[in-house]
Design a protein with these regions (language model features):
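Extracellular calcium-associated, cysteine-rich motifs in secreted modular proteins
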Residues: 1-142
C-alpha cells in the first residue's frame, strides 16, 4: 500500500471517498482532488486531520471505521468490487472500463505521481460516483 496513492485500487474512485472519511464532520474535499481540504492548523504533526485522529502523535488511532461494504475484511479503497455484487466499482460509479478488469481505462495502466490513472484511454473517473437512488450511499457500496 502506498499512503501517497490517491486511488489505491485504480478504479477511478478516490480513496477518501471509498474509505468513508468524508462523512466525518469538518472533513471535506471541496475541489475534488482526492486530498482532504483544510488549513495547516487542521492537520496535526503526524499529517492526519485532527477530526479523524485521537491524538497528534505518530501512533494516533483513527476515530472512524474505514468502510468495508461487504464485511469481508478488505477495506473498500483496496477492492475492485467493494460490495461483492459481481459488478466492479468502476462501472457502478458510472465510469468506463474498456476491458472489464475493474480498473479505470485500458491496459497498460498508467498512473501519475499521485497514483491517479491517466493516459489516452481515460475518458472519465475522479468525479462524484453515482448514487442513482439518491439514498446517500454510493452505488458501488450497496
Amino acid at each position: 500500500m502506498n499512503s501517497l496513492d490517491l486511488d489505491s485500487d485504480n478504479d477511478g474512485i478516490y480513496d477518501i471517498v471509498e474509505s468513508g472519511v468524508l462523512t466525518i464532520a469538518g472533513v471535506n474535499d471541496g475541489n475534488n482532488d482526492g486530498i482532504i481540504d483544510g488549513a495547516t492548523s487542521a492537520f496535526g504533526n503526524n499529517g492526519l486531520h485532527t477530526n479523524i485522529e485521537d491524538n497528534d502523535l505518530a501512533y494516533a488511532n483513527l476515530t472512524y471505521t474505514i468502510t468495508d461494504s461487504d464485511a469481508d475484511g478488505i477495506y473498500d479503497p483496496f477492492e475492485l468490487d467493494a460490495d461483492n455484487d459481481g459488478c466492479n466499482d468502476v462501472l457502478e460509479a458510472g465510469y468506463s472500463d474498456n476491458n472489464n478488469d475493474g480498473i479505470l481505462a485500458a491496459l497498460p495502466t498508467v498512473v501519475n505521481s499521485n497514483g491517479l490513472v491517466t493516459g489516452t484511454s481515460v475518458i472519465d473517473g475522479y468525479t462524484t460516483p453515482d448514487d442513482n437512488n439518491s439514498n446517500s450511499t454510493y452505488d458501488f457500496q450497496e
